Design a protein with these regions (language model features):
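Bacterial Sec signal peptide processing site at the extreme N-terminus
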Residues: 13-36
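Flexible helix-coil transition and linker loops at the boundaries of alpha-helical arrays
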Residues: 20-26, 58-66
Length: 123
């Protein structure tokens, strides 16, 4: 009887100790990104308001020494391109390529598309 209680107590202690083990920090900091993407698709905020919110979130992410999630800079670049701030859009696309090399083909496509639309607009 005492042995059963002792084993139960040891099992409970091991279970609780396993739950209390330090967890690994998340790979990316999603600070405000997902709500902004949702707002973008719902059309509830202007592009400039979204840019301001994402820039603020990016500063917070960097202040904590974390990395923004995949697509963060791409979304920011598309917002900049949408309001005509081409240089900032280019910088955001380049930042996305640098952080996530697997996005290079898509970022190149967006930059090429942006360049082509600028040439068409000038004609």
């Amino acid at each position: 009887m005492k042995r059963g209680i002792g084993l139960s107590a040891i099992a409970a202690a091991l279970l609780l100790a396993g739950c209390a083990a330090p967890t690994t920090p998340p790979l990316y900091q999603w600070n405000g990104y997902q709500p902004q993407v949702y707002e973008y698709f719902k059309g509830k905020t202007s592009p400039q308001e979204q840019i301001d919110a994402l820039e603020k979130a990016l500063q917070e992410i960097r202040a904590k020494g974390n990395t923004p999630p995949p697509g963060f800079h791409a979304h920011l670049g598309m917002l900049y391109a949408g309001i005509g701030q081409e240089q900032q859009a280019e910088q955001a696309f380049q930042a996305e390529k640098q952080l996530f090399p697997e996005s290079t083909a898509y970022m190149d496509f967006l930059m090429k598309k942006k360049t082509a639309s600028q040439k068409t607009a000038k004609q």
